[in-house]
């Protein structure tokens, strides 16, 4: 027991997932089980468990059994939850448990009957997961997974069950198992055995499924081609395509997991009358022929490995027929499968939740004939809330409505605004709902018919918030799906197939249907309007005529819209408050709250700008707030931030040390020192702040901080001392004479030149360092270490400033990225040695990068191998300079 307590900390880390513990730790707690029969995990080995020293004492297990009866979750000790879970799987192996349905399939029945109390579990089959749980005393370790995500494997109890499930229902069954067993590995042999069996299974099933897939794919493609051509050719073919697509959808994505025998036969019967009956029969017939048991077997195999390799596979057509048999236990896998079937040859990774479920078999019309072509758009609609639709379709068979009552109902639901209060503005809704294929709202029909048709709501759309009462969904389904009694409407419903491209999203539709607004809870929950139905129809028609697109969410004519939306009086109720008593025109005036919030977002209207440009009405607290804000802004527009970000090279809190000293003590001509560096870095970064940081870094790294910096300053301030110091400190090559011009006396020649001129021998600014470095690195490489032949200062600095590679790369990259000539900057003076020289001619032997890089910063000093420095400007001198370097 002590040992067990001792290990707790290792396994548990705060997140509730175990941290991967070194295997030795696991062994400490659980030595290999003594009686284990590694080759055959199935038979019970209850006896061996008794020998296991780490098992809980018998008294403990007894207390556990008692608690098992009263499932006391709060105190659930390790064993209890374990056993309880096992018993669950036993009962539920046929009917999926809620948790199981999320992740894993039907779990095969446990290998041995389970009595409460962990002792009775065959020890060979004990999982690391359970051990860990017991080890930690972690009460619901059943939910908690060893190295896997909890969502993926929740209910796997026995090793063997895990083996079966993982191998079958998981894309990476094998690898997952390997993970499990590498942790739990009691003996290498068992693991190997498991893995090998899995791999054999995989091979076998892969071969089988490949053959089968090819056959099925061919059949299906043929039938689909036939259907497509026929449906495009003849108007009658619609209902048949409808039925066949439906059989696809049903067999593939069927929400109420009945084996597809029903659905396929049904679709066959339907399509039988139509000209292309054979095609329907073809797609349906094959699976029904075989016995269910066979099918199930086959499907499991296919599914697992199909899924496992779904990402690599190229022919993604296939077994939607066979999948339908699969019991409704792993929605995830099912979804993935069916998606792969629906999006025929796309190789994208499967996206979950993409499928359009047919909510109920009776509602045949919900899938219009265009379904096959529309797959991509339609499937997107699929379930954001599959649960809702499912429950409805299963529990209630929707009632029949006459066309009359349908219209009535729709009117009521639409005309009441209050339901919309808390809903997001419809524009946003539309972006959330992937485009609805037009085929569901027939458009190009004569005007009067239009009115009738469009007053049917769209097929139930997944709402961003689940406000729709189930009954509303039900009604809509029934309205949309039961073909209304008049034959004429039936005709209409299918016309748009020929007329309008099926995939055109709602945003582009010529006549925007009012129903986009939102599906609203059914009328029973709201006060009835006193309007007669005729009036309502008139209004609907009017709206369709007048209302520009962005007002639609409001459902009322623009005159009123304008009335409120431009003056944001937030806390005042709108002028009319008797919303429903008004004559029909005003029925749509919304309840006070929602008026303002929506229009601004949904349609861009004037008043957001007005808030800034001219003060709108006074009196509302909202307005008051805005005025205050404006005043605040006007008083101190940029004072706060300006110095930091506008010219960071002059003052930044970070760079105080170096910059302040330079600034304070430099003589008059010197203020521009930072400027040169800034231009230098702007070539690389383009932003002053970044420049400043970099510059600071180089200053701090590059110099031996205090001594060098003070020296720099002192030297600059007195030329004579400068001469002495520089001679004493640096071993100079013979031809360098430390002649330093006297700064204070005469005006600086050109800004960028002066920086280098005045510094003369002593530490060059960053730009210079960079130049030096680039030249050394990019020239032939003997120098590349960063040792520049020159005065001692610069040598040290160059090697240190920042890593050679960084500078060199920056410079070179820059150079290579933009070629082209560099504008000459003026006469070249070689201030260093005191001899002013102009050089020209010659082609560089080296790469163009150095030459280019030197061009980037206007005045930069390149240093040649003899240590002399030359001020570069024109291209010619640059070239000669490089030649100098290379010689």
From Swiss-Prot:
GO terms for cellular component: nucleus. It is found in: Nucleus. Residues 57-75, 232-254, 311-326, 399-408, 428-456, 475-519, 526-542, 622-640, 829-844 have a biased composition (Low complexity). Disruption phenotype: Leads to yeast-locked cells. Residues 1-117, 203-293, 311-330, 350-542, 555-578, 614-675, 696-758, 813-887 are annotated as: Disordered. Transcriptional regulator involved in extension of germ tubes into elongated hyphae and maintenance of filamentous growth. Regulates expression of UME6. Acts in a pathway that regulates maintenance of hyphal growth by repressing hyphal-to-yeast transition and allows dissemination within host epithelial tissues. Dispensable for invasion into both host oral epithelial cells and enterocytes, but required for epithelial damage. This is Transcriptional regulator DEF1. It comes from Candida albicans (strain SC5314 / ATCC MYA-2876). The gene is DEF1.
